[in-house]
């Protein structure tokens, strides 16, 4: 497996052909969403950060059902703006606190190379 670095400019190239098993071996959280925010993939590292089983979140709306603490201009607003412009590519710090101890993270959002989907990468700080 290739090493994938959090925050790298070409991270979406590395993920384009990754299997679910490879995705689960990443050292940071990786969540793939469609344009509406529906969860398509949710890796094991993200489960470790949030305590949520990937099987329980696949198909749910990330902003409404999985992480309502992200339903803010700072998080969901950036996602929607990037989706609307077709060029989602942003990085910022955030605090996840929905049904968990407040956890400061770095978030990296990128448009996927394949399909009409988007990645949210999460690393604890």
From Swiss-Prot:
Q: What about PTM?
A: The 4-hydroxycinnamic acid (p-coumaric acid) chromophore is covalently bound via a thioester linkage.
Q: What Pfam families does the record point to?
A: PAS
Q: Which residues form the PAS domain?
A: 23-86
Could you tell me which InterPro entries the record lists for this protein? PAS (IPR000014), PAS-like_dom_sf (IPR035965), PAS_fold (IPR013767), PYP (IPR012130)
Which residues does this entry mark as bearing S-(4-hydroxycinnamyl)cysteine? 69
Its BP terms in the Gene Ontology are: phototransduction; regulation of DNA-templated transcription
Picking any one GO molecular function of the record gives: photoreceptor activity
Q: Give the signal peptide as a residue range, or say none if absent.
A: none
The organism's place on the tree of life at top rank: Bacteria
Q: Which UniProt keywords apply?
A: Chromophore, Photoreceptor protein, Receptor, Sensory transduction
Disulfide linkages recorded for this protein, renumbered to the chain, are none
Q: Which NCBIfam families match?
A: photo_yellow
Q: Which function does this protein serve?
A: Photoactive blue light protein. Probably functions as a photoreceptor for a negative phototaxis response.
Q: Which family does it belong to?
A: Belongs to the photoactive yellow protein family.
Identify this protein by name: Photoactive yellow protein
Species for this entry: Halochromatium salexigens (Chromatium salexigens)
């Amino acid at each position: 497996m290739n090493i994938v670095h959090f925050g790298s400019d070409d991270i979406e190239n590395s993920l384009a052909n990754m299997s679910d098993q490879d995705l689960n071996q990443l050292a940071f959280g990786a969540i793939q969403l469609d344009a509406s925010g529906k969860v398509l993939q949710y890796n094991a590292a993200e489960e470790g950060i949030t305590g949520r089983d990937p099987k329980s979140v696949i198909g749910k709306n990330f902003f409404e059902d999985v992480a309502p603490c992200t339903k803010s201009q700072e998080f969901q607003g950036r996602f929607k703006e990037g989706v609307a412009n077709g060029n989602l590519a942003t990085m910022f710090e955030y605090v996840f606190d929905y049904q968990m101890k407040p956890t400061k993270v770095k978030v990296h959002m990128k448009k996927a190379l394949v399909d009409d989907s988007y990645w949210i990468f999460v690393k604890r700080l």
